[in-house]
A protein has these predicted regions:
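Catalytic cores of nucleic-acid endonucleases
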Residues: 121-170, 176
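Active-site metal-binding core of divalent-cation-utilizing nuclease and nuclease-like domains
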Residues: 49-125, 136-139
Length: 211
């Protein structure tokens, strides 16, 4: 994946000035995480139709229609009362359905004879602010908790932004999550998706720290 427009760069509020790498905070919003993971399922997992279920706040933060349009996904039909809800299709016959409704799983797809269901969270990926780093931690814990509370129909995946802190936490959680049948995936700033496995995380940590 190489998407240059998933991250939204914003000036930090006064209490977070100087607490990010660079002058702007890089927000990887939850809606962007959903779309990146949906594209991952279409491109690498053999899915043909993926459904995402954002809420109203996600639609305010991220322009689903414009982003999908840049990837040759044209709106075929509308769903609900929002401007972005609907079915989007590309020339290859793949579809992404944007259905603004909670309680259905953030990203859902059927691949072969099983269902993939993902819960997603976003966050600021270049922050050093303790509160925002903690928010990234909580996001991963919340997604895992939601999946544990949901009856499994197939693969269950917790999906959050890739940062050094989420990578460390994911590595610690992965063994116990595996016992519960839950996978963890981390989304990078350009849409790359890493399935967390202990050997892989060690390699990625070394690459990110220059060790």
């Amino acid at each position: 994946m190489d998407f240059e427009d998933l991250v939204t760069a914003l000036a930090p509020p006064p209490n977070r000035v100087g607490k990010s790498d660079g002058p702007h905070e890089h927000h990887l919003y939850e809606g962007a995480v959903m779309l990146a993971f949906a594209m991952h399922l279409l491109r690498t997992q053999g899915a043909r139709d993926v459904r995402i279920h954002p809420d109203g706040e996600h639609g305010k933060q991220f322009d689903f229609t414009t982003w999908l349009g840049r990837r040759d996904f044209t709106k075929i039909s509308s769903i609900g009362s929002t401007t972005y809800g609907g079915v989007y299709g590309n020339p290859a016959g793949q579809t992404i359905t944007v259905h603004p409704k909670s309680g259905l799983g953030d990203v859902v797809a059927e691949v072969g004879n099983h269902v993939i269901s993902a819960e997603c969270k976003g966050g600021i990926i270049n922050t050093r602010h303790p509160g925002q780093v903690s928010r990234l931690y909580r996001g991963l814990c919340e997604t895992v908790g939601l999946l544990m509370a949901t009856p499994s129909q197939g693969r269950q995946i917790a999906v959050v932004p890739l940062t050094e802190s989420t990578l460390r936490l994911a590595e610690r959680l992965a063994p116990r999550c595996a016992l519960a049948g839950i996978e963890i995936a981390l989304v990078g700033s350009r849409g790359e998706v890493m399935d967390v496995k202990l050997a892989e995380t060690a390699k990625v940590m070394a690459e990110r720290t220059g060790a």
